[in-house]
Amino acid sequence: MLDGIRDAVRKFLGGNTSYEVAVEEFIKDIQKALISSDVQVKLVFSLTNKIKERLKKETPPSNLERREWFIKIVYDELSALFGGDKEPEVNPKSIPWVIMLVGVQGTGKTTTAGKLAYFYKKRGYKVALVGADVYRPAALEQLQQIGKQINVPVYGEPGSQDAVGIAKRGVEKFLSERYELVIVDTAGRHGYGEEVKLLEEMKDIYEKIKPNEVILVIDASLGQKAYDLAKRFHEASNVGSIIITKMDGTAKGGGALSAVAATGAPIKFIGVGEKIDELEVFNPRRFVARILGMGDLEAIIEKMKAMEDYEGIQKKMGEVMTGKSKLTLRDMYKQIVAVRKMGPLSKILQLIPGMNMMGDIPEDQVKVGEQKMQRWLSIMNSMTYQELDNPSIIDKQRMRRIAMGSGTEVEEVRELIEHFNTVQRTLKMLKRRKKDVEKLFGQMGG
C-alpha cells in the first residue's frame, strides 16, 4: 500500500533534475499514489495545494537542504491527512477497564478481540474475553480457540440468543474475579449501509454493561466508504475509538485511514496481518515515516527535533525549580529519550564540563548505563497514564504487573521508582537552597 510514495521520495532525493522540476514530478507521483489507494480526490488535491502554499511562504532552516525541507513539508501534511499528532491512549486510564468491540460482518472483529487480548496480556494486564456474538454460529468457538492459544479465559453461553444478557453476565463474572481488562465481542450481523441498526444494538449492550471504551472495527478494504460508518459511530459514542483491520491485504488502506481521520474519530490500532501479534498501535507520524521510507526521513526529522527537545527539557526543569510544575515519570521518560537521541552515552559524557578531568569512565560501566536506560524505558512503556503522572500510586501489585508487561524484574521497577524519588528530593533541596541564597542577597541589599 502506498509504495508509490516511497519510490517518489527515493527518486526525488537521489535525482539529478533541477529542484523545481523534481518538485513538480514528485507532486504528480504522490497524487497518483494516493488516488490509487482510494483516498478521496478532493483530499488529495487539498493536500498537494497545502504543500505548494508552504513552499511559497516558508524558508528552509539553515541546517536543511531544500530537498530535505520539501520532504519534511510532505511528511507534515501527510501526517495531518492521516490524523496529525494524535497519539492514541493505549493504556487503560483506570483498572478495571471494560472494552466493547462492535463492527459489521466480515471485518475480522472476533480475531481482533483475540489480538487485543494478546496485546494487553503482553503488557502485564490480567485479561478476559466475553463472546456475545450470538448471530454467527462459529463466533464463540473461534473466540474460545483464540483464548486457548493465548491462555486467556473466555465466557460464552452456547445456544443462547441473549446477546445483552451474555455480555452483562460475562463482564460481572470477570470483574468479580478481579480481572483488570475485559473485552466483549458483540454481534456483527449487519453489513455496510446498515449502520443505524448496528448502532442501535451497540446502544442496548452499552447501557447494560457500561463499558469504559467502545471500539469500532472497520475493514480497510472499505476505502473511502469508511467515512460514513466512522462518522456515525463517532457522533454516537463519546468513548469511542477505531481499529482498521486487514491493512496488509488491500490497496485501499490509505483511503480508509484518511476517511476515518477526516471524521475526527481516533484510530487506535491497525491490523497488519493474520498472526495474533500483528496488531499495531496507530501513530500517524510513524505510519507516514514508514511509507515515506524511514531511513531517509529519520535523519531529516532528527535535525529538526534535536534543538526542540533540548529546549523543552530546559523549560520543564526551570518550571520544576520555581515550583510552577512537578516532576513526573513522564518527564523522566522524555529526558531519557532526548539523551539517547544525542548519541552513545560515552560521547555525551565527554560533552559534560569537568568529566574529562575525571579520567575515562570504564566502558563496561557506560554499557551498563545504556542498558539501564533502555530497560527503564521498557518499564515506563508498561505503565498506565495514571502511574506515569502519579508514581506514588505504584504499589507491589502494580509493580508485578509492570514488570511482567515490560519483561523485567520487580526489583528493577522498584529501582526506577527509588531513583525517581531521589531525583525529586534532590530538586526540592536545590529549590530550598536557591530560596536561601535569594533571601541572603535580599538581606545584604537591605
Swiss-Prot record:
Q: Which GO terms describe its biological process?
A: SRP-dependent cotranslational protein targeting to membrane
Q: What is known of its domains?
A: Composed of three domains: the N-terminal N domain, which is responsible for interactions with the ribosome, the central G domain, which binds GTP, and the C-terminal M domain, which binds the RNA and the signal sequence of the RNC.
Keyword list, A-Z: Cytoplasm, GTP-binding, Hydrolase, Nucleotide-binding, Ribonucleoprotein, RNA-binding, Signal recognition particle
Gene Ontology, cellular component aspect: signal recognition particle
The name on file for this protein is: Signal recognition particle 54 kDa protein
Q: Per the record, what are the reactions this protein catalyses? A: GTP + H2O = GDP + phosphate + H(+)
- Main localization of the protein described in the UniProt heading: cytoplasm
A Pfam family cross-referenced in the UniProt record is SRP_SPB
In terms of SUPFAM superfamilies, this protein maps to: Domain of the SRP/SRP receptor G-proteins (SSF47364), P-loop containing nucleoside triphosphate hydrolases (SSF52540), Signal peptide-binding domain (SSF47446)
From the Swiss-Prot or TrEMBL record, state where the protein is found: Cytoplasm
Functionally, this protein is described as follows: Involved in targeting and insertion of nascent membrane proteins into the cytoplasmic membrane. Binds to the hydrophobic signal sequence of the ribosome-nascent chain (RNC) as it emerges from the ribosomes. The SRP-RNC complex is then targeted to the cytoplasmic membrane where it interacts with the SRP receptor FtsY.
Q: Name one GO molecular function term.
A: ATP hydrolysis activity
Q: EC class of this enzyme?
A: hydrolase
Instruction: State the superkingdom.
Output: Archaea
Species of provenance: Metallosphaera sedula (strain ATCC 51363 / DSM 5348 / JCM 9185 / NBRC 15509 / TH2)
Q: Which residues bind GTP?
A: 103-110, 185-189, 245-248
Extract the InterPro entries matched here: AAA+_ATPase, P-loop_NTPase, Signal_recog_part_SRP54_M_sf, Signal_recog_particl_SRP54_hlx, Signal_recog_particle_SRP54_M, SRP/SRP_N, SRP54, SRP54_GTPase_dom
Q: What is its EC number?
A: 3.6.5.4
Regions annotated as coiled coil = none
**Protein family per UniProt:** Belongs to the GTP-binding SRP family. SRP54 subfamily.
Q: How does it assemble?
A: Part of the signal recognition particle protein translocation system, which is composed of SRP and FtsY. Archaeal SRP consists of a 7S RNA molecule of 300 nucleotides and two protein subunits: SRP54 and SRP19.
